[in-house]
């Protein structure tokens, strides 16, 4: 069956160094799943926190299902993530260190189940972001120069 991507968090790669990745399941309501199947979700500004040995996803916006009735879900509710206890403890230990946070990188369906890929992230400083942009520009210019050179020959 494979994976079907719902949405990416491109901003996370811009704002953070991703050091480690984890996969987690999500506890969802029926209308949330239907909305996700339609691709109506937004990962921007979302983050995960560990509380009482459980991990929760904050600020994940899933649009209300268009054909839902009064049983429709709250778009910005707290969502519990499903992970092994050892993984949660590992994340909690890292989060307590200064500068680390857990951010969702992408939301997808895997074998029919909604999953979120979490990244253990360390915040980038402004000069790091500038450096990354400079590298990206240089690689783009090199690729463009190579294309132009290959066209002329």
Curated annotation (Swiss-Prot):
SUPFAM superfamilies according to UniProt: Small protein B (SmpB)
Protein localization: Cytoplasm
Gene that encodes the chain: smpB
Name of this protein: SsrA-binding protein
Region (Disordered): 129-153
Gene Ontology CC, one term: cytosol
Chief location: cytoplasm
GO terms, molecular function: RNA binding
Cytoplasm among keywords: yes
């Amino acid at each position: 069956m494979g994976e079907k991507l719902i949405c990416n968090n491109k901003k996370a790669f811009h704002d953070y160094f991703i050091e480690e990745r984890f996969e987690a399941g999500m506890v969802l309501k029926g209308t949330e799943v239907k909305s996700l199947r339609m691709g109506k979700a937004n990962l921007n500004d979302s983050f995960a926190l560990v509380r009482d040995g459980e991990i929760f996803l904050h600020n994940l916006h899933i649009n209300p299902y268009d054909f839902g009735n009064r049983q429709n879900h709250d778009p910005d509710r707290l969502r519990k993530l499903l992970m092994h206890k050892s993984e949660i403890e590992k994340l909690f230990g890292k989060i307590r260190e200064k500068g680390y946070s857990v951010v969702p990188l992408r939301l997808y369906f895997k074998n029919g189940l909604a999953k979120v890929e979490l990244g253990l992230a360390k915040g980038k400083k402004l000069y790091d972001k500038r450096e990354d942009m400079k590298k990206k520009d240089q690689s783009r210019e090199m690729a463009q120069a190579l294309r132009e050179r290959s066209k002329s020959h």
